[in-house]
Amino acid sequence: MTGTPSAPTTSPDDQADGPGEGTVDRQPYRELGLTDDEYERIVATLGRVPTDAELAMYSVMWSEHCSYKSSKVHLRQFRDTPATDRLLVGMGENAGVVDVGEGLAVTFKVESHNHPSFVEPYQGAATGVGGIVRDILTMGARPIGILDPLRFGAADAPDTARVLPGVVAGIGGYGNCLGLPTIGGEVVFDPVYGGNPLVNALCVGVMPVGRVQTSAATGVGNAVVLLGAKTGRDGIGGVSVLASATFDEGGGPARRPSVQVGDPFTEKILIECCLELFDRGLVTGIQDLGGAGLTCALTETTAAGIATGQPGGMEVDLDLVPLREASMAAHEVLASESQERMLAIVTPDALPEVLALAERWGVIATNIGTVTDSGRLVVRWHGEVVVDVPPGSLADDGPVYERPLRRPADLDLLRADAPSALERPRTGDALRATLLRMIASPNLCSRAWVTEQYDRYVQANTVLAQPEDAGVLRLSASGLGIALATDGNGRYARLDPFAGAQLALAEACRNVTAAGAEPIAVTNCLNFGSPEDPEVMWQFAQACAGLADACRRLGLPVTGGNVSFYNQTGSAPIHPTPVVGVLGLFDDVTRRTPIGFTDEGDALLLLGDTRDEFGGSEWAWATHGHLGGTPPAVDLEREKLLGEILVGGSREGLLTAAHDLSEGGLAQALVESCLRGGHGARIELPAGADAFVELFSESAGRAVVAVPAAEQDRFARLCADRGLPCRQIGVVTDGEGGSLNVAGEFAIPLDELRAAHEGTLPRLFGRGA
């Protein structure tokens, strides 16, 4: 495999022709998603017409999914977010890495598998979990937990009954088999997601600080080793078709590719094999095979190696790749997205030990190539050179577009349609009926039907899990631990994408701090419609600007993330849906704060200000089908202060429960905390206050906490000294025959609340979880 490669095999006519009508018929680049300009750029880069294999490689690597060609100009501002002392690896690698102390580092990232999960819900969701787990593994970490932010069409829509059970079963089936607890996430229903469900997955892992891996292929003469499953035709076109194209009005892509097929057992042994390789220091570089398969792994590792300044390049023989189907062509082998595969760079001295270790684990390991100093990626197939390209042209130097932006034409009318004109409940009976209707609505009801299909406590390190505000994991015997939460609100972002992104970050931070953890890093998954629509791109630009601004003001680094475009059916895009994940840190997880009210007599305190804010609210949507107005105001300084008070109160042992207020307002939070802890609550609203606003407003920057009576004055002084509004709204009552009693308005027994809250999803999707 050494020496000067011959030119890739093409016909003399193809070599002579330049781009234009003469080559269009022979090279179907448009069908592969490339534009005329992009094709001409490829020809100019190579100085010739590309081979079929090269054309396939450029088509997937320059797809929206791989190249970020429409989003890159806006994502750059995330690099300006604070680089804290804890940040070890930021944007640019497979996942961000932060130092959490005690010689440990944590890596986490959220990605999407939206389009495959609509086509094949079970496999799409399962392989979405598998892919994000391998991203975490690639950094050198042991995966330890999963979160799954999900969005579906209307809860009673026929296709939701097809998609949701399959997605949930896929996540549970794959994650449970890997032995990974699913500790958090979201389930949201809205008709805009009917043809485009959002299946986002976050994984978190832990490792020794000194074991961080990189993807760079360096060291001339080092071996290129393919680990894991054999390569088949599953997933071919998954990137170039599914993640970079809209669905047609019939509910599917115009070109239907093969969705990847997952095997969690193979992934499990691959994880253990790779972790032992890392522990023994047997690899110099590592990359998972996900979107675009070998094409992406080979080009990214080679380009990363060259970027280090060391001599770099790679030669690969595809005949050595273990195949499931012997009839596959070169471009199919390169584009296959078969799951459970990794690419390792190994020194010649370590190669025998690597192969022996893989054999012991039952993992297929094959030396398929060599690191060179040619500066090029050369691929042979049946003895002929089919690829000879500069790897950076694929991995780093693809097209970058500054697409036109246009404020949505209907936005002013949408914002002017404020919910203030909607009929509001004014009597105690009407408030009672509204509360019962709200807590039974698809977006506010219990998620137990979903979460009970996941193993939330496997590995015995889960401290808190759904339905808590954040998932909490123990990292060491000392009590060191982390909290994770994901949040997003498409309705808020539809009304104001800048504020909507900031509200998503603010809520994720509140969830983490309500559990008692200090936020230290952010990841994001940006789900939007077609980038070819100027109105969608305006929404995207606004959301990026809002999120970057909020991260800077809160002092949080963005460690990485994902962009998912083309989430629309025909000309109808989804709501702009930035999903934000926040990582928090505990010194001692035994000091975590749950949401449940458990101690009779505890004072219930409301932190923050309540305003008449119902734009984009769950009340307006669930009771009136209304979307309009402006979302709640976001005050990032207040959010930061609230978080500091919640974390401080937790560490000082002043809180027995804490719950952030978001969708559904105070009423929803009280119901969830009462049911979680099995105790009632007696609430007294301020004299002369509007009971409806007090109970259902979605004002941001608020939380309800339970404080032992003996600590109430101390906690109130803590809030007063820092300038955080704090007022007592009630007390926790007994658990036997308890109720949620709002003085002067209504009382609802816990049993009635539980029946309303827990019955919706089983009724819609079946009793068997």
Curated annotation (Swiss-Prot):
E.C. no: 6.3.5.3
Q: Where does Mg(2+) 1 bind?
A: 111, 562
What cellular component GO annotations does this protein have? Answer: cytoplasm
Gene Ontology MF annotations: ATP binding; magnesium ion binding; phosphoribosylformylglycinamidine synthase activity
The answer to keyword Kinase applying to this record is no
Q: What is its main location?
A: cytoplasm
Q: Is Nucleotide-binding one of the keywords UniProt gives this record?
A: yes
Q: Region Disordered: what ranges?
A: 1-30
What are the binding positions for substrate in this chain? Answer: 112-115, 134, 260, 337-339, 564
* Pathway as given in its UniProt record: Purine metabolism; IMP biosynthesis via de novo pathway; 5-amino-1-(5-phospho-D-ribosyl)imidazole from N(2)-formyl-N(1)-(5-phospho-D-ribosyl)glycinamide: step 1/2
Q: Which UniProt keywords apply?
A: ATP-binding, Cytoplasm, Ligase, Magnesium, Metal-binding, Nucleotide-binding, Purine biosynthesis
Residues noted as binding Mg(2+) 2 in the record, renumbered to the chain = 135, 288
Positions contributing to ATP binding: 68, 109, 524, 561
Task: Tell me the protein family, please.
Answer: Belongs to the FGAMS family.
Question: What does this chain do?
Answer: Part of the phosphoribosylformylglycinamidine synthase complex involved in the purines biosynthetic pathway. Catalyzes the ATP-dependent conversion of formylglycinamide ribonucleotide (FGAR) and glutamine to yield formylglycinamidine ribonucleotide (FGAM) and glutamate. The FGAM synthase complex is composed of three subunits. PurQ produces an ammonia molecule by converting glutamine to glutamate. PurL transfers the ammonia molecule to FGAR to form FGAM in an ATP-dependent manner.
* NCBIfam families per record: FGAM_synth_II (TIGR01736), PRK01213.1 (NF002290)
What PANTHER family does the database record attribute to this sequence? Answer: PHOSPHORIBOSYLFORMYLGLYCINAMIDINE SYNTHASE SUBUNIT PURL
Could you describe the subunit structure of this protein? Monomer. Part of the FGAM synthase complex composed of 1 PurL, 1 PurQ and 2 PurS subunits.
Q: What is this protein called?
A: Phosphoribosylformylglycinamidine synthase subunit PurL
Source organism per UniProt:
Parafrankia sp. (strain EAN1pec)
